Amino acid sequence: MLSLAACHQAASNLPGDSTDHQPWRGIARDEVVHFLGTEPFWGGEASGNELTYTTPENQDGETITVSRFAGRGGLSFSGNLAGGAMTLAVTPGECSDGMSDRTYPFTVTLQIGPDVRQGCAWTDHQGYRDATQKE
């Protein structure tokens, strides 16, 4: 019984509204999520149960089957890439790729095995802004 109480107490420290039990709806299930990162360069898109991961060395990319999960504060796609576990987490928040004047509406964290990368994302309905565009 003590371990259950301890687990419950730790769960109260989770971010967000603890009474909100609805999955995040910031990206519709039918939207295509485009993502990119630099240092090293990588990118791709996720749609439905498929994710295509691209690099300069593999511009056609590798397409894998993924599971989509909408949590309380974002969206994730999980599958196996290059023989290892892969998760792409998408969360709302302004993002800059550091190489262009674009501002993206989502940040992404890509983990392939032990390798973790940060990047940006957008959808066809929620695009990026160039510095010359007004909000």
Identify what each model region corresponds to.
Residues 3-6:
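C-terminal motif of bacterial Sec signal peptides marking the signal peptidase cleavage site
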Residues 102-135:
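C-terminal partner/receptor-binding element of secreted or periplasmic proteins
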Residues 1, 89, 114-115:
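Processing junctions and N-termini across compartments
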Residues 15-38:
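Post-signal peptide N-terminal segment of mature Sec-exported envelope proteins
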